[in-house]
């Protein structure tokens, strides 16, 4: 890979900005100042800007704690999007949410620029689970629990895959739901079959990776390689 391209991708700058860094002697390759953007890097080469090493990332994976009122989209003419919350941290990346949460819902949203990985975790055949804490307006019943386990048939005739539901509070109004399917407004429609409404919905985990409790609503952080793997291996 050319040095100027490497700088643009790892330092999150434009090619012209990378050229400026090079011309000012701020870039080193294996400890030696290099001003030629056309320099071809070899495996194992160490690149630094102002002495700070740069690490190449082919893709970015972010965990975001989505607040209420934000839409799960890359762009929107009216509302703040999950990508808007990232700001200018990745100007050269085309980030998008892998899956969605309703505007009123909160919790774990995965943002990435890796289309292949997004397809992998969303594909029905992969069965990557999503876990939610849900507040309903009618106590959980054995009929609901059994129906979820057997697979709910929605009002429009759509037959859903089996899911898991359990009460988290003695009154049965706060429950945990685990799905391996992604149908529009699925949880609300599932409870609607039993005449129950959903007052709040929070995504706690995707696959084997739980939302970091240190992230306040609207905050985000990068995932480690191990965490990315946990999403699919712990599904």
Give the label of every model feature segment.
Residues 1-235:
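Basic, flexible Lys/Arg- and Gly-enriched helix-loop patches that mediate nucleic-acid binding at interfaces
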């Amino acid at each position: 890979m050319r040095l100027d391209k490497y700088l643009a991708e790892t330092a999150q700058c434009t090619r012209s900005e990378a050229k400026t860094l090079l011309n000012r002697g701020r870039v080193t390759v294996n400890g030696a100042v290099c001003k030629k953007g056309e320099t071809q890097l070899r495996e194992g080469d160490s690149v630094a800007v102002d002495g700070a090493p740069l690490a190449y990332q082919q893709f970015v994976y972010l965990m975001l704690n989505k607040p209420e009122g934000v839409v799960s989209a890359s762009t929107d003419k009216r509302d703040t999007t999950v990508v808007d919350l990232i700001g200018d941290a990745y100007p050269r990346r085309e980030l998008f949410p892998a899956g969605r949460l309703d505007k009123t819902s909160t919790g774990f949203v995965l943002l990435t620029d890796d289309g292949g990985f997004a397809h992998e975790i969303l594909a029905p055949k992969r069965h990557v689970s999503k876990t939610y804490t849900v507040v309903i307006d009618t106590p959980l019943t054995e009929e609901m629990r059994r129906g979820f386990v057997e697979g709910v048939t929605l009002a429009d005739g759509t037959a859903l895959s089996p899911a898991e539901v359990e009460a988290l509070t003695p009154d049965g109004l706060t429950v945990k739901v685990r799905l391996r399917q992604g149908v529009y407004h699925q949880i609300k429609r599932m409870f609607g079959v039993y005449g129950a409404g959903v007052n709040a919905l929070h995504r706690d985990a995707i696959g084997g990776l739980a939302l970091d409790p240190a992230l306040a609503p609207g905050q985000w952080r990068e995932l480690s390689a191990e965490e990315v793997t946990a999403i699919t291996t712990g599904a």
